[in-house]
Amino acid sequence: MKRIAMLAAACVIAVPAFAQNVATVNGKPITQKSLDEFVKLVVSQGATDSPQLREQIKQEMINRQVFVQAAEKDGVAKQADVQTEIELARQGILVRALMADYLQKHPVTDAQVKAEYEKIKKEQAGKMEYKVRHILVEDEKTANDLLAQVKSNKNKFDDLAKKNSKDPGSAERGGDLGWAPATNYVQPFAEAVTKLKKGQLVDKPVQTQFGWHVIQVDDTRPVEFPAMDQVRPQLEEMLRQQTLANYQKQLREQAKIQ
């Protein structure tokens, strides 16, 4: 086994430089290194490294080289708009690389995640969420007619919503919007919801940009804040974005901008 390993190493050392190219296109080499980098990029996005993948990428690199050479031969690469796109692409690559490098050097810590979690949890303390149902119609008269029918018999709400509501997302469920904090809704819908207690119906229809609403709150409960592990990925991403925003602000303050 040791002898085989030594022979393999010797073969690698003895390989001439041209053998490190996986292909050439009109004399232009496609190197093993560039293929490996391309494969690494694709694998980082979820693909599995395999001979089939490497062959596909190799053919893609050949195709690209064929097109690039044709573009250069025809003078396309020298066109002003193409040069602008190339420069914008170069800038984008550099910006992404800079951000990735900065985040690697300034990673989000567990302490930061915990502090952010506790901060948001404190802000949400005492907040309520509501189980709401509504009937959406186009005009006030229809809304008033429906409201009167519901007031006479709340059991009618389900059927009236199914037959009359213009909200396709909730009509088939009898107007049920499920559980949500009032902030999920537009004003003045949200304001109307917060004024209602469990089982209450609005006194009059509420108008929004969507039309006229007959609103009923079926139930209320305190917002249940998720465990930290459940929201850790979102918190980490939010903190990374904050880190980058602060870095950008720092760079702009240091730059001479006229």
Swiss-Prot record:
It catalyses: [protein]-peptidylproline (omega=180) = [protein]-peptidylproline (omega=0). Residues 127-219 form the PpiC domain. GO terms for molecular function: peptidyl-prolyl cis-trans isomerase activity. InterPro entries: PPIase_dom_sf (IPR046357), PPIase_PpiC (IPR000297), PPIase_PpiC_CS (IPR023058), PrsA_foldase (IPR050245). Gene3D superfamilies: 1.10.8.1040, 3.10.50.40. Keywords: Isomerase, Rotamase, Signal. It comes from the Bacteria. Residues 1-19 form the signal peptide. Transmembrane segments: none annotated. This is Probable parvulin-type peptidyl-prolyl cis-trans isomerase.
